[in-house]
C-alpha cells in the first residue's frame, strides 16, 4: 500500500487529483515531477475552459495490462446463501480437519453487531478460513476479504499465451474465490480508490471487511510491519477496527505438516478500537500492529 500513501501525500501537498494508472507507471522522481506538472496544467485548463480535464481510459489499461473487476453480485442474497452453504458444508469442516483451532477473546465481541474492519497477521492462504471460524455467526456471515488485486485479476483474465485448460482453471479459481470467499481486489499499484469505494459499499450493506496489513505472508513467523495504507482505509471507512491474530499455523506450515493437533492453532480476538477522523494513517498502522502483537 506504499503507493497509496505516497499518492495521497502528493495530492494533499500539491492540491491535485492524480491519475492512478499514470502514477503507477512513474518509475523515477523525474516521472513524478512531470506527472505533477502535467496534472497541474490540466487542472488549470479545466478551470479556464469550464469542463473537467479528460483522462485516458483505454490507454491506461494498456499501460497496466489490468482492469480490476468488482462484482456486486457477490454481495447479493443468492450468492450469500451459496457462500454460507459452502462454508458450513466444506470450509468449516476443512478448517477443523486441518487443525481444530482454539479461539480466545470472543467475549470482546459481546454486543458488537458490526460492520467492522478486521485486521490480522498473514500466515498462509488458509488464514481466511480460520478467521471466519473464529468470528461469531453474525460477523462471519457477512465478511468481505481484500486480497492482492493483481494476482486476483490475472485469474479472471489469464494471459492469452497461457494453455487453454490453465486459463479455464484460473477462471474457475477466480469464480470460486469471489463467490465462496467474497474476495475483492486491493491493488498494489493502481485502482486502489475503486477498491476503497467497493469496501465502503460493502460496509454500507452491512459487511465487515478483512484485510491483512502486512501485505504478504510472514517468512519467519514474526509480524511484518503494517503498511500505513490500512490507516487510509480506516479513515475512509470510519468503523470500529477488530485486531485478530493467528498463532501456531506458521509452525505447522514451516514443518511441512498437513494437519495440526487440536488446539495447536490459536486464533486470538482483541477488543474493537476506533480512531478519531483524520488520524495520521501511519499512527493508525502502528497502533494496530501493536494491538495485534499484544494479543
What label would you give each PLM region?
Residues 1-64:
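Phosphopantetheine-dependent thiolation modules in NRPS/PKS and related acyl-activating systems
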Residues 5, 126-130, 229-232:
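Short amphipathic alpha-helical face segments that pack within enzyme cores
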Residues 10, 118, 211:
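Conserved S/T- and glycine-rich ATP-binding loop of Class I adenylate-forming
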Residues 50-82, 149-169:
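Compositionally biased, charge-rich terminal segments
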Residues 74-98, 157-182, 193, 197, ...:
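Alpha-helical membrane-targeting segments
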Residues 91-122:
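Helix-to-loop junction immediately C-terminal to a conserved catalytic motif
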Residues 113-190:
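Catalytic core of membrane glycerolipid acyltransferases/transacylases, capturing the structured
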Residues 190-295:
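Non-catalytic C-terminal accessory region of glycerolipid acyltransferases
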Amino acid at each position: 500500500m506504499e503507493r497509496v500513501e505516497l499518492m495521497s501525500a502528493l495530492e494533499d501537498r500539491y492540491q491535485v487529483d492524480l491519475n492512478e494508472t499514470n502514477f503507477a507507471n512513474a518509475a523515477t522522481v523525474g516521472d513524478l515531477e512531470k506527472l505533477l506538472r502535467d496534472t497541474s496544467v490540466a487542472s488549470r485548463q479545466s478551470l479556464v475552459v469550464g469542463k473537467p480535464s479528460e483522462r485516458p481510459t483505454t490507454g491506461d489499461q494498456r499501460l497496466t495490462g489490468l482492469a480490476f473487476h468488482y462484482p456486486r453480485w457477490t454481495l447479493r442474497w443468492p450468492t450469500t446463501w451459496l457462500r454460507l452453504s459452502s462454508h458450513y458444508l466444506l470450509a468449516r469442516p476443512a478448517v477443523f480437519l486441518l487443525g481444530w483451532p482454539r479461539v480466545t477473546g470472543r467475549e470482546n465481541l459481546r454486543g458488537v453487531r458490526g460492520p467492522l474492519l478486521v485486521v490480522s497477521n498473514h500466515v498462509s492462504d488458509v488464514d481466511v478460513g480460520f478467521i471466519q471460524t473464529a468470528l461469531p455467526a453474525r460477523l462471519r456471515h457477512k465478511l468481505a476479504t481484500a486480497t492482492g488485486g493483481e494476482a486476483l485479476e490475472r485469474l479472471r483474465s489469464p494471459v492469452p499465451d497461457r494453455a487453454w485448460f490453465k486459463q479455464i482453471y484460473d477462471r474457475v479459481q477466480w469464480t470460486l474465490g469471489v463467490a465462496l470467499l467474497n474476495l475483492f481486489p486491493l491493488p498494489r499499484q493502481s485502482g486502489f480508490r475503486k477498491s476503497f469505494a467497493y469496501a465502503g459499499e460493502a460496509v454500507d450493506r452491512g459487511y465487515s471487511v478483512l484485510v491483512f496489513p502486512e501485505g504478504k505472508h510472514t517468512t519467519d513467523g514474526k509480524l511484518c510491519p503494517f503498511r500505513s495504507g490500512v490507516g487510509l482505509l480506516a479513515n475512509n471507512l470510519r468503523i470500529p477496527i477488530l485486531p485478530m491474530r493467528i498463532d501456531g499455523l506458521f509452525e505447522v506450515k514451516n514443518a511441512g505438516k498437513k494437519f495440526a493437533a487440536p488446539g495447536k492453532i490459536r486464533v486470538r480476538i482483541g477488543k474493537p478500537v476506533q480512531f478519531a477522523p483524520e488520524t495520521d494513517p501511519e499512527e493508525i498502522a502502528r497502533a494496530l500492529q501493536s494491538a495485534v502483537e499484544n494479543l
